[in-house]
């Protein structure tokens, strides 16, 4: 899949895999990058005035105030060239603001994509503490599989490992924290959907969902929307509310 620079709804990120990794991956894991204690979430600017999207007429899945209240738009103080097109502006405190209309659009696109897969062949991962419960709830809602916490090397690449699985698509909470899962997905040739913040590299990601991927409320909202939209495209009635994705946090 390759990215269409016209930024149409169906655009996908170009998958540029590295060389195939050996089955015996390094045991150095992302726990060092994603400590159990997550950073405090920055305080949003006034939700009545904050400019968070380029398309002010966009028909969003939820009110823009709900995105703001969850901090979905709050990026980091760093940005990559890969994520530049998803950034709307920079705040006075130096934080980059993600374009909420692009987030909303990419949730829909990801749901369209996932609805084509057997639910049990979808794997979602999260090494980040605040992403674990929402990721597990997403898997429960759509019938997917979840591997949260430390991703064991060989899960996708070593048939001799007891926990070996063969999913058809991978959803990750953070390409940095979930780098082992992404690396193995590239090795076995399955597409990767990733929640990406302003500081993420996306060269190994097939479909970016731009969002604050460090805040617990932001991840709850995005995973909840993705679950509901995926179910909707299958013709199933969503039965989970946002509270269900936040109860375990």
UniProtKB/Swiss-Prot annotation:
CDD domains per UniProt: RPS2
Start-end of Low complexity biased regions: 23-32
Ranges for region Disordered: 1-54
Pfam families in the cross-refs: Ribosomal_S2
GO cellular component, one term: cytosolic small ribosomal subunit
Sorted UniProt keywords: Ribonucleoprotein, Ribosomal protein
GO biological process, one term: translation
Domain of life: Archaea
Compositional bias segments (type: Acidic residues): 1-22, 33-43
InterPro entries in UniProt: Ribosomal_uS2, Ribosomal_uS2_arc, Ribosomal_uS2_CS, Ribosomal_uS2_euk/arc, Ribosomal_uS2_flav_dom_sf
GO molecular function: structural constituent of ribosome
PANTHER family: 40S RIBOSOMAL PROTEIN SA
Homology family: Belongs to the universal ribosomal protein uS2 family.
The protein's name in its UniProt record: Small ribosomal subunit protein uS2
